[in-house]
Amino acid sequence: MGFTDKGRRGYSRTRRDLLSGASVLALAPHTWFDFSDLSTLFQDADGTTAVAADADPIGKVLDKSGNAHHLTQGTEGARPAYKTGIQGNRAAALGDGGDHLDTAAFTEIAQPNTIFLVARNPAYSGTEVYFDGIASDKRHAAFDYTDQINWFAGSSWGGGVVATESTLYEVVFNGANSPLFENGVGISSGDAGAQALTGITLFGNFEGGGNLSGYIMEFLLFNSALSVANRELVRSYLNEKWKVY
């Protein structure tokens, strides 16, 4: 990372700017959910009651990209919980195996798309989905299955370990050449398929199954194959913030 505090004013500005997320916002993310940012979290789907304390339900999450791709859940019993002090002394959302959050449909975006995910699945069992689309033929998905994380956008391939410890994943959905990075290290590349994307589900699949019993800290989607330098910028922001590795 290269951030060592030696008392220089320049260091403080650099680290503060990185953690502000301003440099990430300048890359024009398509969709951005941050479960440590209380200003974006509400207990109800209408966004009238703010999340304020540990174990509060999360019924709405504002999209920090500015594109208004907000997540909602209208069913009280299917809302993940806000949990404090989970990773890097920051809060995360916890799914109990029966929760999920969904965006409304947005304008279809074709591949390539770059997705960053910070998550933890400490009690992995069977098939558990971190994220998915909202329609059967317009999906980008990540799910734990057969002791590895799998990626799907029409075809499925496995690469990377299950996040029993907090993990920073980044994947470029780019058809037959879809590379995966885990905690900054290139793991593998495979064929994820060529489907476009029209919406996002977190903590489960688009049909309401495969629900995650674990944590999601942050999710970022870019409608492009980010350059190496820009992926490093986003990765640095996420790791400096969440202290994953």
How would you label these PLM feature ranges?
Residues 34, 114-116:
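Active-site-flanking beta-strand signature of metal-NTP-handling nucleotidyl enzymes
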Residues 156-157, 196-221, 226:
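Extracellular glycan-interaction patches encoded by glycine-rich segments
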Residues 21-22, 103-107:
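Surface-exposed ligand/attachment interfaces on beta-rich extracellular proteins
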